[in-house]
Amino acid sequence: MSAQISKLATVSDGAILGEGVAVWDFSKIRENSIIGDHTLIGDYVYIDINVSIGKNCKIQNSALLFDPCVLHDGVFIGPGVILTNDHNPRAISNTGAKKASTDWDKVGVEVFTGASIGAGTVCIAPVKIGNWAMIGAGSVVTKDVPNFALVLGNPARQVGWVGKKGLKLIPLDDSNFLCPVTNEKYSLSNGILSEMANK
């Protein structure tokens, strides 16, 4: 099954789209970007040059993903999310001259497997969003987010942990947590939450 591309979308000849990719109306995918198998791109999405997106991702309407961001497999990007690439943005240099593309160092956002970024969130590069982390809608992320962390607000702060199902985990004690639906257990050690061997 080849990619399904809306006639109203713009996809550069230099972009690589995997099997089963869907690109909806008025989205733009730039050259040298890579979109993994079965990823869905909503309406009015902008994917910059050199962006890498894994398999089975969902990029919702009006999201803006700037070079050099990387999304691993199974990432959810909500409507209106912005992944930035310039920590010190300026239109002109200190001399007043117009800045060229070589006048600044691009920095990126990296989103790891299974993570979700809620609608209207802005991630200020450089940041890394850990595996299965969840960012609440409307957040402004200014620092790295640990695996399974639940963060929200401006600036985004951690308010708990979530499991792979995306639900807030119930603390059993200071270092053990439980998913209220799947009964999967997680263990916290040195600030790192890990999934336990669930049987």
Residue ranges and their predicted role:
Residues 4, 13-15, 22-128:
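Flexible, glycine/small-residue-enriched loop-and-beta-strand segment within the central core
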Residues 88-90, 157, 185:
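Active-site/binding-pocket entry motifs
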Residues 131-134, 140, 186:
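Internal alpha/beta core interface subdomains
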Residues 147-153, 162-171:
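Short, intrinsically disordered, charge-biased short linear motifs at domain edges
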Residues 158-161, 177:
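Cys/His-enriched microdomains
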Residues 163, 179-182:
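Short cysteine-rich clusters marking metal-coordination/redox-active sites
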Residues 185-199:
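Short metal-binding segments enriched for Cys and/or His
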